[in-house]
């Protein structure tokens, strides 16, 4: 039951927002208001901020009053969406604005002195204070997006003022591997190749001004055959083989030692055979 009531209230709010947006478009076409010139708007803003007398557009005189900053609101996607409403924080609404009775309207002046009227209501379903009718027109005029800040202030005579500022949005930044390569140490020890310096390579739209070090690794041919490491005999008769990119040579002393070991093995084998023959003769005589 509670979910059905909540859904019904949400649908009703969407319908009201659509109707109010259509009414605002009709009012805009009927009024045909145009923004004030930039110079006049700037002069009017300075006059209102500093309390000086500024000439009006029709020859009148506007006396600016001191303002009291009330609060700021960072608008959310729903505040600038199609719901046509701005949620006012409860503590600020109850402190600065009058009671949200049926048909209550709040009038604000922007930085150019243009009046803006918003319907001010209290939604019991969500227990929130909102500005509805007129808000979407202000969003379009100020080109508000999620993350922008809306500022509210008031004067001693009871007038309300509204202002805004856009947040700084950073465009998408392409990743440049050239800038990342610049941060690499210049003298790295190559294990299986050599290090060369090349022009910076940029993947995307990065702007790399400094030269970047790019590493090229030379591939090394296999140094081991099926039975082990491949050995080579140099012109001096010394044996050599390649291990991890390094030529390892075996000196003549190693070969001589190997030959001596082979000779010792041959002598031991001959002594062993003669001993076996003598044992066989002695065993035959004993029989």
Curated annotation (Swiss-Prot):
This is Putative B3 domain-containing protein Os08g0157700. Pfam families: B3. It comes from the Eukaryota. The keyword Transmembrane helix does not apply. Residues 17-29 have a biased composition (Acidic residues). One of its GO terms (cellular component) is nucleus. Keywords: DNA-binding, Nucleus, Transcription, Transcription regulation. Its main location: nucleus. Residues 71-168 bind DNA. SMART domains: B3. It comes from Oryza sativa subsp. japonica (Rice). It is found in: Nucleus. Residues 17-36 are annotated as: Disordered. GO terms for molecular function: DNA binding; DNA-binding transcription factor activity.
